[in-house]
Every structure is written in C-alpha cells, then in structure tokens.
Amino acid sequence: MDNCNAWDKLLSQNESTINSTETATITAIIYSPSSKTLHQFINICFPEGSNSILDTTLINYATIGWTNDLKENYSVDVYTLIRNTDDALDLLKPFLQEHSSKVRWLILLDWTLNDQKLWLNELSYAFNKIKQLNDDNEFSVWCLNSGEILNLQRHTTVWQSVHIDFILQTLRSFCYFNDSSLFYICEDHTEEKREEAQRLKYQELLKHFCEDRDMKDHIEMVKRSEILIPKGCDSIGLIKTVDERFEPTEVKEQHFLARYMDFIPTIDKIREDRKTTSGIDLDKLYPLEVFKVNIQEELGKMFAKYRENSRI
C-alpha cells in the first residue's frame, strides 16, 4: 500500500510537467478574397516559413506548429481557401465531415481591394454557408490593410469619415450578432522595429484566438485603423458611440443590405493588381472549370496529405 501511495504522489507531483509536453490540435480555416491578401495575412500573423506551405490560388492544407507564451504546444491544421469561385466553400465539405471538434474560421477582408460595397453581402453569404457545412464554429473577421482608410480619405473625393464609420458600425454589428471577433490589421512600414513589433502583436492575437484564450487585453475600439474587438467584448451601446444615429439591430434586416450598398462609395478605376497572372479578375466569381487545374486531383492530393497527417 505504501508503494502505491508513493507512486500516486510521484504522479501527482509530475502531472503538470507531463501535461505541459502534450500537444493540442486545432483546426483553422482561412477564407480569403485573393491570393495576395492570403499571402500577406500568413506573412503577418503566422510563424516564419508558413507562407511557402500555405500559399495557394484556390485551396491548400498544411499543419503549423507553435509554442505559446505559457509553453503550451499546439498543432494547427490550417486550410486556406480563396473566394474566387461561386461555390468555393463547398470544396471544404469532405474535410469538414472528418472533423468533430470546433473549427476556427479566419475570414479575410482587404481595404486595398476596392470591394467594401460588397463586404456585408459576402459576409452574410459566407456565415450562412459555413453554418450549413459545420455546427461547431468559432468566427473571426480580419480586415487587412486598414491603413488604407487614411489614403481613401486623403486621395479621393468620395470617401469621407462618415463612410468609414458606417462600415465600422456595420461590421461591428454583424460580428456582434454572429458571435464573431473583429480585427483590423494595420501595418506600419516606416520603421523596421515597429513593423516587427506589430507582427509579434498580431501573431499573439492569432494564437489567443485559436487557443480560445481570454483576449480582453487586446481590445481597441477608438483608433479607426487598429480596431480589435474579440467576441463577447462589444455591445449595442458601444457600437452606437461611433454614431448614435446608427441602429445595430437593423443590420439583421433584409432592407439594410440595399442601404449599405447604396451608401458605400466605390473608386471608378479598379486597380490592376486585382487581376491574377492568368488574367482572372478577382472582382468576379467564376465556375471552377475556369481555373487551369484538375480540382478533383488537387482535392485528392490534399485529402491524402490530411489523412497522412491525421494518421486516420
């Protein structure tokens, strides 16, 4: 009996050490409007070297590992998907059917793509579709290049602060009612040390989101280009402080979409960088047949890689 008690005591003393060496597995899906946006997001928010294994023109999969500030190890199954087809999300069906755990969604928007008028419609469609594909989701919306907000106001005659605020309140309301986090990513390239500090900040933010950790220390609601609002940290009252005339509950109503699209301006000239090297305009949605790849073959390779990694 004494030997048993001694063994139990030894196990108890070393339990925390044993647990600290375990690796938790997470599933994350990045849904991006373009390859360029995806490349930038991975470069900013993921560990160095992730771009080469996650970059894609349509769909990809890889496993990324990291150790957080608590010395906890994580293995993250990351899927990347480009929103350049009208049924892109359906490509994830076979992979989502394999999962029984929560899926972290990182839905990207990009201030440099001149498609702000479409954001609400695209988010509504994506969230509804995702909820049909999977029951257990953790949502986040990431708006890249939010420093472009200042350029739009400085260098165009159509963009004013009222438009920026209207988009912000719309996104905050949508995320509030859909239990989603909202993060603006603003890079400052003026100083190398500051740029590196920003990347470390956003990498920490991503880790906290994926690990379901408390994010109250990461809240920013004042600086328009640096908004950081984790799920559960916003409210109707806080949203209205931007402009009290805005009614957050209206975002849930069908008529609001038309109002949003009518109010948000566009720039006359669509930028050339929205076209891929193959000449496909990412402002438009195309059937999968347009892309010069064998979709079934690519999915087969990706699924084989997933099964090998998962040891199914």
UniProtKB/Swiss-Prot annotation:
One of its GO terms (cellular component) is cytoplasmic dynein complex. Pfam families: DLIC. GO terms for biological process: establishment of mitotic spindle localization; establishment of mitotic spindle orientation; nuclear migration along microtubule. InterPro entries: Dynein_light_int_chain (IPR022780). Keywords: Cytoplasm, Cytoskeleton, Dynein, Microtubule, Motor protein. It is found in: Cytoplasm, Cytoskeleton. The dynein complex consists of at least two heavy chains and a number of intermediate and light chains. Interacts with DYN1. Belongs to the dynein light intermediate chain DYN3 family. Present with 1170 molecules/cell in log phase SD medium. Component of the cytoplasmic dynein which acts as a motor for the intracellular retrograde motility of vesicles and organelles along microtubules. May play an important role in the proper orientation of the mitotic spindle into the budding daughter cell yeast. Probably required for normal progression of the cell cycle. This is Cytoplasmic dynein intermediate light chain DYN3. It comes from Saccharomyces cerevisiae (strain ATCC 204508 / S288c) (Baker's yeast). The lineage of its organism: Eukaryota, Fungi, Dikarya, Ascomycota, Saccharomycotina. The gene is DYN3.
